[in-house]
Amino acid sequence: MRPELSQYKHLSAGKVREIYEIDDKHILMVASDRISAYDFILDTEIPDKGRVLTAMSQFFFDTIDFPNHLAGPADDPRIPEEVLGRAMVCKKLNMLPFECVVRGYLTGSGLVEYKQTSSVCGVELPEGLVESSQLPEPIFTPATKADIGDHDINVSFDVVEERLGEARANQLRDASIAIYKAAAEIARERGVILADTKFEFGIDEDGTLVLGDEVLTPDSSRYWPLEGYEAGSVQPSFDKQFVRNWLTGPKSGWDKDSGLEPPALPGSVVEATRERYIEAYELISGQKFCQWIGSCV
């Protein structure tokens, strides 16, 4: 259910977030407990998910040395009490039309493409890689942004260059890989593998490239436990892959290619997903989720 914030104008709704206008330079970004999978927004929500996403984004925005769109603290007085802990005050940006995906490990759609072409988004990879193989170096594999219900489409770097120009495309690629490497090092020090992630960038009024949207959350990233990692099999995860696996498993009775809406998640899957999201936040940030604003009340 969308929060009714009478003091602000509602601008748009995404799969997970609601955007409100604060003034001509700032927006309020509110993370709901909705969860999406296979381009569907599920009927079942995950309690506290929006707070975890906001807490995780806040942690990395504060930690990673790169311009970002945050324009106030987590307890900014411009955030209404009813969404405190799941909302951020952000600068308005001219968002760039690409999902900036960085992969350090081979899995998901990247693995499917690799098996067909020995490459991912035009990036040639060595022979012999298997599910969950670590790549020699992280690779930039952009995708076009899709409307709700449509698939993001993986594209080659040439497409980004054609759309944005060589200089901006190079800046986008280099920034994405640098941020991924910094975050992956932080995660690894805490016993977690950052397998891949996606970023969104925008341009501010000064022409500066700025990191926007959410960043390095369990929604936008694949996180695996370092302990027990072994290439060649699907890894346990701290992200929504758990939901994807249940939906495509025998217990759901659902075929993702059927065109039908997915079923409701059972309580056990909801609680296990909530626990995984919270565990990811606590492991990587080193902070207790109960200490985050609006949690454990």
Swiss-Prot record:
Which E.C. number(s) belong to this protein?
6.3.2.6
Disulfide partners: none
Which GO molecular function annotation, any one, does this entry have?
ATP binding
The cross-references to CDD domains, in alphabetical order and at most eight, read: SAICAR_synt_Sc
Gene3D superfamilies registered for this protein in UniProt: ATP-grasp fold, B domain, Phosphorylase Kinase, domain 1
Q: Which reaction does it catalyse?
A: 5-amino-1-(5-phospho-D-ribosyl)imidazole-4-carboxylate + L-aspartate + ATP = (2S)-2-[5-amino-1-(5-phospho-beta-D-ribosyl)imidazole-4-carboxamido]succinate + ADP + phosphate + 2 H(+)
Report the GO terms under cellular component.
cytoplasm
Q: Give the enzyme's main class according to its UniProt record, as a single word.
A: ligase
UniProt pathway: Purine metabolism; IMP biosynthesis via de novo pathway; 5-amino-1-(5-phospho-D-ribosyl)imidazole-4-carboxamide from 5-amino-1-(5-phospho-D-ribosyl)imidazole-4-carboxylate: step 1/2
Q: Which InterPro entries match?
A: SAICAR_synt/ADE2_N (IPR028923), SAICAR_synth (IPR001636), SAICAR_synthetase_CS (IPR018236)
Q: Which domain of life is it from?
A: Bacteria
Quick one: a GO biological-process term for this protein?
'de novo' IMP biosynthetic process
Query: One Pfam family this chain carries?
Result: SAICAR_synt
- What HAMAP family is this protein classified in? SAICAR_synth
- Give the family from UniProt: Belongs to the SAICAR synthetase family.
- Know the name of this protein? Phosphoribosylaminoimidazole-succinocarboxamide synthase
Its gene?
A: purC
